[in-house]
From Swiss-Prot:
PROSITE patterns: G_TR_1, G_TR_2. Its main location: cytoplasm. This is Elongation factor Tu. GO terms for cellular component: cytosol.
Length: 396
């Protein structure tokens, strides 16, 4: 058995297990961990089922989520795997973006086929922009009738297609997490096949650095004799000195040129994703720009006021509201670095939303914000967070 060596140059991919609560997500996660440890002991740590199953509570923006993080490697990639055991935990994790996924393994028990939660998870995966799903048909050892397995597979493929995933071509791998954990060679191989499918079919994520430049403005000040400087943390992309940029959001779009880039009082030729920097803007007055706008590569993002969103409303215990709200509720929506007031319209058939619920809603902001599908936001009242959501569709 050739030892694969640890290479930092391997692509890093975030994946997760999703699906109905009793279909064996956690068992499969433990099986993947064990099978890869046995196959590549130099690359992987030994993890037992109990350590994954006792998903620790995490606080993400004040929201309590039970979630397990497991790391493992194949020869080709390094994976960070999230497993949210409870249905509510999964929903919260997806909506709040606590753990972004580059792809997900939809776990469906061959004994049951897709259930209501399976459908809800697939819908949510599409809404929050999980780019790729593949399927683990778990508990396949318990179904002796091949035709029945084929039928369940067909049903799952139809479900994927109905939510705009590639149901025709997505890998569907028949596995048994439990048997693989017990070391049964046939089912150990099934988990190896599953991970090979993950390696081959989940596309390499586009790194933040390779996306078009975007920096939310946190602060604006004037340097006498030089002009206006905006500061913030570059969210994505790279920006070279003397590049043209646009300032988007809140006011009409302005075009300008970045004539200086500074970090920790040092002059730079380039700003990179993840760095805190100051950008000197040509011909822009201090009062022309404000916190909450973004500096971007021209044409890469547009300002919008009206959108559909999927939102989780904090429970009272999480420090949220104590009572429900209705349509026409007007809280603040905190995007990146600023609050903008917006009016909520609830979907037909939803009269009110209780603390602890998740819901879809339509929002009309009073000022435009640089927006794209999947953008996260917090809902706030008087400075405290009462909800967390993501843009699922831009209306105007």
């Amino acid at each position: 058995m050739a030892k694969a060596k640890f290479e930092r140059t391997k692509p890093h991919v975030n994946i997760g297990t999703i699906g109905h609560v009793d279909h064996g997500k956690t068992t499969l996660t433990a099986a993947i961990s064990k099978v890869l440890y046995d196959k590549y002991p130099t690359l992987n740590e030994q993890r037992d089922f109990a350590s994954i199953d006792s998903a620790p509570e995490e606080k993400q923006r004040g929201i309590t989520i039970n979630i397990s993080h497991v790391e493992y490697q194949t020869e080709k990639r390094h994976y960070a795997h999230v497993d949210a055991p409870g249905h509510a935990d999964y929903i919260k994790n997806m909506i709040t973006g606590a753990a972004q996924m580059d792809g997900a393994i939809l776990v469906v028990a061959a004994t049951d086929g897709p259930m209501a939660q399976t459908r809800e998870h697939v819908l949510l995966a599409r809404q929050v922009g999980v780019p790729y799903l593949l399927v683990a048909l778990n508990k396949s050892d318990m179904v002796e009738d091949e035709e029945l397995l084929d039928l369940v597979e067909m049903e799952v493929r139809e479900l994927l297609s109905s939510q705009e995933f590639d149901g025709d071509n997505a890998p569907v791998v028949r596995v048994s997490g439990l048997k693989a954990l017990e070391g049964d060679p046939q089912w150990v191989k099934s988990v190896e096949d599953l991970m090979e499918a993950v390696d081959e079919s989940v596309p390499d994520p586009i790194r933040d650095k390779d996306k078009p430049f975007l920096m939310p403005i946190e602060d604006v000040f004037t340097i006498t004799g030089r002009g206006t400087v905006v500061t913030g943390r570059a969210e994505r992309g790279t920006l070279a000195i003397n590049s043209e940029v646009e300032i988007v959001g809140i006011r009409p779009i302005q075009k300008t040129t970045v004539t200086g880039i500074e970090m920790f009082h040092k002059q730079l030729d380039e700003a990179w994703a993840g760095e805190n920097c100051g950008l000197l803007l040509r011909g822009i007055k201090r009062e022309d720009v404000e916190r909450g706008q973004v500096v971007v590569k021209p044409g890469s993002i547009t300002p919008h006021t009206d959108f559909e969103a999927n939102v989780y409303i904090l429970s009272k215990d999480e420090g949220g509201r104590h009572n429900p709200f209705y349509s026409n509720y007007r809280p603040q929506f905190y995007f990146r670095t600023t609050d903008v007031t917006g009016v909520i319209t609830l979907p037909e058939g939803t009269e009110m939303v209780m603390p602890g619920d998740n819901t879809e809603m339509t929002v009309a902001l009073i000022q435009p914000i640089a927006m794209e599908d999947g953008l996260g936001f917090a809902i706030r009242e008087g400075g405290r967070t009462v909800g967390s959501g993501r843009v699922t569709k831009i209306i105007k």
